[in-house]
Each structure stands twice: as structure tokens, then as C-alpha cells.
Amino acid sequence: MSAKKLLDDYVTDIQLQLSEGNFDLALKEIQNALISYPTNSKLYINGGNIYKILGDIDNAELYFTKALSIHKSKEVLNNLSVIHIERRNYDQAISLAREAIEIDPAYVDAMYNLALSQDSLGNYDEAEKYSSKACSLNDYKDSRYLVLLIRILQNTCNWKDIDEISKILDQHVGDGVEHPFLSISRTDSEEVNFKVACSWEKRDIQRDNDAKKFNKKIKLGYLCGEFRNHPTYHLIKNLFKHHDQSNLEVYIFSYIHNDAEKEYIEDNVYKFVNINDIDNEKASELIKGYDLDILIDLAILITNNRQDVINNDSAKKIISYLGYPGSSGSKIYDYILTDQIVTPISQQKYYTEKFLYMPRTYQVNDGERIYLNKKLTNKKDHGLPEKSIILSCFNQSFKIDNLMLNCWIDILNETQDTYLWLLEDNEISKNNIYSYAEKSGIDSNRIIFAPRVNRSDHLDRLKLSDITLDTRIYNGHTTTTDSVQCAVPVVTLMGNHFASRVSSSILQAVGLDELITENISDYKSLVIKLTKDSTYLDEIKNKLREENQYLKDFYDLKKFTKELENNLNKIAN
């Protein structure tokens, strides 16, 4: 009869297999060890960790749960909390993280997971409490905690310490933890944005730049998960029907869509392919089978993207467009569809993608002049004073920063009968804005929050605004187009990176360069001038209603699509 293998020998063999990356063999050793040592919680923990690395969270949960039944530890509770976060079971994740913190009140990893779960549920007060505590206990060294805290502070318009924390995060640029979207929303430094994007890209990709023969009829694919009530859909929904079907075969590869929007798009393309229910590897193989010449990714780095579907075999040329205003930092994209306002040629060094310029604004719109709609609404219906000048901003709260809100408050202080009309994003941001205003001597009645409503109702009420006030670091994009289409002037401050120059691009395209400013002082002066000079304000509004060439071109989707196709033909040839 052979002697029982010692636990230490099993542990040595497990560690050897792990050091060589042999996860399957390590798991076999663990399973063999558990036959002899079925009550050893560390074996289950090691097994759970390996399954988690392999992406098998079902077995990971099974092993961690077994370990917990043998010995209750903060680490296992936290590991289970992470699994429930991945499954979006945030209430369960919160419960497990709280148990871990009861064992160790200074356990920062559990505090982070608790904050992350609360943030995902929109419980920003609890999220801020625990993310702040995690940062403090960690001496602000872990960029994961910093990233979460800044995101929460942005969403709640709590700017007390945000500049200082942002400077600390700048020291971690390049560690691959900060998401590029957070970077472009907190700083307009293209250099910083680019470093963050490049460090976020984990795949080692080298594109084959050899010339490849295109199909006689160009096969053009779009990858998109936004055919639903989403800004991308609202902008691009009417483009597809204008593609030249005699020279193009247009394919849509869609995930996360609503039936009505799917049906509308499907009627205007060669083939609509639903990849929602298949994993990235299978979706990638599916796309490869269509032998695409060009693939345009409409999501890139935004929430719910499927960037991992794209690889070297997806298409002969791959383009980034519309969804993400900046460089992806990935070499998988050959081009970014852009314009000379949002990305001057001097900024090419901060992009992995080559610039593919549209002649006017890069941003497509649905071609509809909203202000022509006849539906009647009035200020009283929306809690707005009848005799008033309404200064609106319907951007999400994360786009508002302290410098811009102070500017808006100064404008209210220096003008009469003006009211600030903002989107009610969340209760905490609303209360924080009220608090900032009151400390500056502004009656809170002069700041009016509008609830979220369906798009049609929103556009009807938007026409009641006199001036749209743009945000600074991250402009309005779809919201700026909405204002233009409702004949509401937009005052913007042109920044240094893509996201802070989009409104300038749109205003230039509609012939309203005079609404583009270059510093906060000029921005403030222009808004005050418009509020006090009704003749000038009416003149600007009329420019958005008249039949001039700028507006004809802006709303001419057929022309926009032709110009897009000209760029695609350049690539093909």
C-alpha cells in the first residue's frame, strides 16, 4: 500500500505547475489533494483563484463557498463579493463585502468592492464614503481606489478634493488601471489621454499594412450595440439608407438592440447580423466569414463595447467612429473618422489611428430640423418662469466641473431674469449644485432641474431654452446637435482634446463660429451679451432657422454619406 502523499508535497507540486502556467495540471493536483485533505480550506481557495483566472466563475464560486464553509475568512468573503460584482448581483456583493469588513474594519479591498457595488446601484453617498475611506487607509497609493473615487465625485458634482486627487492619479498614468473614458472626462491633455489609452490596451496587436485587394463591391460592416434609446442611434439612424447600394454591401453586426430600432435599421442595409447571444470568439469568427473590406466600430471604448470581437482578420481596414471621442490606444484600428476641428493634424502623434477627415463636422446627425415640429409646450408646463431667459445644459452631471459651474453662477449674479435649467441626473449632484449656488448668493429657485423624459418630449421642451451652455472638458455631443436642431444657440469653450472640441466642430459646420470661445472669461462675456442683447440673440437664433448653405449641408444626410463613402473609396484605392 503506497504512503499517503504529504500536504506539503501537494502544495509544492501545485506551486510548480502554477509557476509554469499549467493551470489545468495545478487544478488536478488540487483535486487529488482534496481527496486526502477534504477539510483544507486553502486548497479550495487556490482552486477558486485558478478557476477565476480561467474565467470559470461558476466553479470559482463553488470552491470559494466550500472554503468559506470550512473557515470564514475576509479574503474568501471578498473573493465571493468580486464574483457577484461580475455577475452584477450587487446586493449580494455588498452583503459579502460588509461581512469581510466586520472581520477587519481596515480591509481596503472589501471597502473598494463595497463602494464599487454601491456606485453601480447609484447609491453614491455610500459609494463615496467607502471609496474615500479605502483611499485614505491606502494613503492614496492604489489607482483602482482613486479611479473609483474620482468617478463618484464627478457624478455627484462634489469637487472639494477632486483636483488634488486627480493630480495624484496623474502619477499613475501608464499603469493600465484608469479607463480612457475617465481620462478624457477629467483632463483635456491629449498627451495624458493617449498614455492612459495605450496602457489600457492589453492586446499586443500588429496590423498587417500590406495592400489587400478589396472586393469589387465593397463590403462595409458596422459593429454596434447602440440600436436602442442611445445617443449613437439617434445620430446615425438615418445614415444607412443613404449608402450607395450599387457600390456597397452594408452589414450590421449588432448586440444590445431593441426590436423597433433593429427593424428600422434592418430595412436599410444588405444584412443585419445579431451577435448579441454569442461570445466574442464565435462572433469574431462569424465576422471573419463575411470577408469584409472595411469594418467601422461605433462603440470602441464606451460601456458595453465588443472591442474584443475585432482582430486582424475582421476586415482589411478597421475604422473607429462616433462612439468614443479620442484615441483607442489600440493598433487594431487603422483610421479614426474625424475632422480638422476636433483633431488638428498637430495631434496625430497622440493617436494610434490615422486621421480620416470629413470635410465639415465628423459627427453625423439624423437630418431632422426639430424646431419645425408643431407640438406646443410652454414654460409653465416645465416649471419655468414665463418672463425669463432660460440658460440650459442637459449634459450628464459628470461633464460639469467646478470652473464651469462657478462661471454659470457668475452669469446668474450679473444678469436679471435668467434661470439655469439642468438635467436632474441624481439627487446628490442636484443638492451639491444647489449648495454651491446658495454659498455664492444665488437663490436656489433660479436653478431648475428637469427630469429625464423620452427623447421626443425632451426635444419639445428643449425649444423653450434661450441659450445652451456647453460643458468644458467633455462637451455636449448629441446634446449640442439637439440644441442646434431645436434652433437654440450653444455657447462653447474650445478645449485641447477631441471631447472638448466637438461643439466647436458642430458650430463651425452650421456657420456659427461666433459662439466658439477660447477661454472662460470670453465664454462668460458672450453668454451675458446674449442675455442682455435680445436683438443679437434673435439674430443668432434666426441663423439656425434660415435656409443658408451651412444648414443645408448640415442636414443633408445624402451628402454626408457620399463624403463618408469618398473616404472609404480612398482607403479601398
Label each region the model flagged.
Residues K219-G221, S392, W421, V491:
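Short, well-ordered beta-strand segments
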Residues L239-S246, L391, N402-Q416:
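Short hydrophobic signal-anchor/transmembrane segments that target glycosyltransferases
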Residues V309, I411, D482-S483, I506:
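Hydrophobic/aromatic ligand-binding patch that stacks against planar heteroaromatic rings
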Residues K463-S465, D482-M494, V510:
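Conserved donor-binding/catalytic loop of nucleotide-activated donor transferases
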Residues A487, V502-E514:
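Acidic, glycine-centered active-site loop in nucleotide-sugar glycosyltransferases
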Residues M1-L384, Q396, S435-G441, N454-S465, ...:
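Alpha-helical solenoid repeat scaffolds of the TPR/TPR-like class and their adjacent stem/linker regions
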Residues N247-E249, I409-K439, S444:
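A conserved nucleotide-sugar
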Residues I302, D470-T480, L493-R501:
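Nucleotide-sugar-dependent
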